[in-house]
């Protein structure tokens, strides 16, 4: 798993002032099963089981909640992540 969130200056490309890449990769696989990112020029989007779709970014808290929700769905583990 990789969770990277950068605070960046607000700009036309990045009005929220945030860049991010959140990835969950299953053991023994190389491609992420869940990936949220907002690289240029695509902007906010996510990949769930290899299917890319737009993502409606609101704030970092919502981003983290949505990411955890998708990982829980694909792993079937309602307690993920364990502390």
Regions found by a protein language model. Give the residues of each.
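The feature represents the first ordered module of a protein
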Residues: 1-45
